Amino acid sequence: MALDKLDLYVIIVLAVAVAAYFAKNQFLDQPQDTGFLSNDTAGGNSRDILETLKKNNKNTLLLFGSQTGTAEDYANKLSREIHSRFGLKTMVADFADYDWDNFGDIPNDILVFFIVATYGEGEPTDNADEFHTWLTDEADTLSTLRYTVFGLGNSTYEFYNAIGRKFDRLLEEKGGERFADYGEGDDGTGTLDEDFLTWKDNVFDTLKNDLNFEERELKYEPNVKLTERDDLTVDDSEVSLGEPNKKYIQSEEIDLTKGPFDHTHPYLAKISKTRELFASKERNCVHVEFDVSESNLKYTTGDHLAVWPSNSDENIAKFIKCFGLDDKINTVFELKALDSTYQIPFPNPITYGAVVRHHLEISGPVSRQFFLAIAGFAPDEETKKTFTRIGNDKQEFANKITRKKLNVADALLFASNGRPWSDVPFEFIIENVPHLQPRYYSISSSSLSEKQTINITAVVEVEEEADGRAVTGVVTNLLKNIEIEQNKTGEKPVVHYDLSGPRNKFNKFKLPVHVRRSNFKLPKNTTTPVILIGPGTGVAPLRGFVRERVQQVKNGVNVGKTVLFYGCRNEHDDFLYKQEWSEYASVLGENFEMFTAFSRQDPSKKVYVQDKIAENSKVVNDLLNEGAIIYVCGDASRMARDVQSTIAKIVAKHREIQEDKAVELVKSWKVQNRYQEDVW
């Protein structure tokens, strides 16, 4: 009988959890509107999707929901290949650029592709949020829609590919016809590109065999025409030298301190302070403070800061050598779209050097589909054969390219034995090399105590490969360069950057940034206890939470218990913000407790945060009984799963229930936002 009651209890809890989820988590502090998304349609097109399709005579629509640029890149590449192989008139569209009132009127002679990523805890990407709301709550019949969906996700997350699966289900439920099978890719297993290629091949088979489209010989057809401008130089004011957008080129005429600031328009923030938190032979970590006092850029504790990157001098030199662009660095060119729906990806006219430094992802891994696409431009027949062979062999590509972490230039020069690829059109490079995207960091400051300053905490990424190459993080090494220069440490950086920026706009020590809202928030009720779990830089937003509660106490506000579980390798080497925690404890008193785990301090015993959680299970259970909210930040692949498993075991033990029931109960807390994660 007791088990029957327990089953009923779990069912009730899950029902309440679902209700809480759709109530938009009213008991939590809601993120402020920071103006992340712009409502302006890129390229000046109508926001009427049906009108745009008809006006431009398109019969294939590819919609992307992208947070880091991968889904957008896939949509663009798929569009080009569908057009080239089958002659379909394709159009790539950002969800954020259109309204959806008449989406159900799209006729059945138009094929619609959805390339959508899942972000955070099963949420749509920022640009797909409005469409997600429309599809979920407002869409009626979609009986004339012919669609297919590819979802991008990470299986280390609880809600793996939730948005792709949801879109596919809802589109069918509302009457849509799936013309090709749903597909999904898993970044957690490192097979995202391969999963996409497999799905793409299946779609092409469907287009040929079921829809009877005739396949043509694949050839490169540019969407843009490049014209060099001999009448312009780098000294001309209209020429872009890497500015984020045209507003920055016209900066003397426009007030750049006013938002909204978003993924199309950042704020150029001064870096007021940097300091090294630790340094070791393997890695180091920097603390960076951005001054936003001269702008209307706002954030709330728990949000993310997007930092806009540029490429290192070393990777630029290698890329320039690879494509034989040495004598074109300062040459100005202009792009003209050959398709009225194609969006030029950066301001122009612009220089070759500015594109390579500020707009292309030249430091990241190269994909197999890029290998196959560029093979036709190989410098000789032997290299073409090598490229085609490697590109068509998944295992050989994995062994020779992926596992060695070769970027575009590394891979091309490796396959050609150092011969430059001078015949590759720069239009091809612009269309096929992914574009640089902002990198996102959990904010480690409190908007209550630091209203005009945004802090981030970043581990500087440098990996030494067997062949002597250094694989470096783009933004983290840029921040390290700034820390070295700002503090005049005399340290030699692994790679070097142009810190002055286009037209010296980044002097002294400025970078483009914007804020991305997050649901990772402290409870509205300040007396609610919280359990914070964050090893390594996962402690960053949790530091912000603790600082928030410290400020609340200073303001005379009552706060609940705050328990922090923190882990690092060694107490003396990489203990982040070590001196600060005792200061916070002196203010919070009995309402603050910290447990530390050191994984490499004792050679005979590795201790992780989940071990400390288990060791203090009574503390955890008592707080949960008092309504505590759990916050986990850090590695999704192992730590977050191990922590969740440990919490479930604690619940099972102290509440005397079966572990599978405890697992379901903990999952229900996630839906209620009683168990929140900010993981990567």
Curated annotation (Swiss-Prot):
NADP(+) binds at residues 283, 537, 599-600, 606-610, 642. Residues 24-680 are cytoplasmic. It is found in: Endoplasmic reticulum membrane; Mitochondrion outer membrane; Cell membrane. Signal peptide: none annotated. One of its GO terms (molecular function) is FMN binding. It holds the Pfam family Flavodoxin_1. Residues 1-5 are lumenal. Gene3D superfamilies: 3.40.50.360, NADPH-cytochrome p450 Reductase, Chain A, domain 3 (1.20.990.10), Nucleotide-binding domain of ferredoxin-NADP reductase (FNR) module (3.40.50.80), Translation factors (2.40.30.10). FAD binds at residues 439-442, 457-459, 473-476, 680. Binds 1 FAD per monomer. Keywords: Cell membrane, Endoplasmic reticulum, FAD, Flavoprotein, FMN, Lipid biosynthesis, Lipid metabolism, Membrane, Mitochondrion, Mitochondrion outer membrane, NADP, Oxidoreductase, Steroid biosynthesis, Steroid metabolism, Sterol biosynthesis, Sterol metabolism, Transmembrane, Transmembrane helix. It comes from the Eukaryota. One of its GO terms (biological process) is ergosterol biosynthetic process. This enzyme is required for electron transfer from NADP to cytochrome P450 in microsomes. It can also provide electron transfer to heme oxygenase and cytochrome B5. Involved in ergosterol biosynthesis. Belongs to the NADPH--cytochrome P450 reductase family. In the N-terminal section; belongs to the flavodoxin family. This is NADPH--cytochrome P450 reductase. It comes from Candida maltosa (Yeast).
